Structures are given as C-alpha cells and as structure tokens.
Amino acid sequence: MNTAQRFLLDIPDSWEQVDPSGEEPARTRAQALASTDDPREKARINAMFRQGREVTKAARRHGALLVAGTATMYTEGLFMAYGMVFAVNTPKGEELTLPVLSARLGVSSANGVAPKDRIITSAKVPHVGTVARVTGTEVTRLTGDIDVKLLTMHTMMPVPGSTEDFLVVTLASPNLPLKNEVYDLFDAITWTFRFVTDDGVQVSPDGTEGVAA
C-alpha cells in the first residue's frame, strides 16, 4: 500500500523559502551593487534579481509544492540559484525528455528548441532508487519581455506505489560559468530527497515504511 504522504528535501542553510522581494534578498542586492562601480555589472545584477523574482512567481503559478532559493555574495561574486518541486503525471510509454518535462511543468523554452547541451541520463538517489534526470542550459520565457538562461537539472522521483505519478525536483541557476560546481551542488541537494508518511517515517521505493526520516 502506498503510504507516502509528503516529501523531505534538505536545502543548504543559505537557501530560504521566502519571497524574493523580501528584506533579505534586498540586502543581498544592495551588497552586490555596492561591490562594483561598473554600470554594466550593476545592470547585470539588477537583471539577475528581476529574473529571480519572475522565476519564483512562475513556479508558484504552475503549482510548485516547494519554492526555495538563494542570493548570496561570495568573494568571487554573486551566486543565485532556485529549487522547486512539482507534482506531475506521466502516461506510460512517454519519453522523459526535456521538452516533455518542460511541458509537464508548464514552462517552455523561449525559442522552442531543446538545449544543445541537454543530457538525459539516470541518477541514483539513496532513498528513492534509480531515477531519470535531465540537465541542460535552458532559455526560458518568463514574461512577455523577460527571457532567462539557466543551468537546469530536472530529476523525476517516482511516487511509491504508483507507475505514473512523479515529483520533479527542478534546480536552476543563472551562474553559467560555474556549470560544474552548480551541477555538483544540485546533485548533492537532490541526493537528500525522500518520501515520508504523515508521522515522518521514511517510505522505501516499494512503498513500505522504514525508519524515521
């Protein structure tokens, strides 16, 4: 019997489930702007924060079960990333490609073309099992005048006891030069995903209960 009622995902301490227009993001934005005198860099920072607001708004519009993100200043510069979890239903026999995932999430590439660096593969999530994963640099139309290029990782988590229901963990970042580091971080976050009962007991891939999560 399927006893999974909710999920847990460990996100870094610097990530928050907050309104991107709130006080903490505003402080980080001010700090980032103060770190440079270059008008072009200031414009880029403002654009990144505007895009961040639109990413989280779009996620909520499309029914995200979880929306989290970070805007953190490091010595090397500003790092931004977003994490979202969506519930989707995939009919039997449907290929798990990036366009399919994008359509399921209600987000299409701005130019309608799959990313050239798209990789469709499998990944091992300890508390879930072997899952499908798609990575790529997506150009996504957020609003009528905003396109954003993001490093993305979509990981399909099969709901225990179902062959068609999935939770999709989507992680994205506009920090394109940090591709390897970003994907390592995303993999580490996704690695912590697990399904649990209402009482917080972990549910194994076959739907049976295990230890407390």
What is the meaning of each model-derived region?
Residues 157-164:
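Short glycine/proline-enriched loop/turn "hinge" motifs that connect secondary-structure elements
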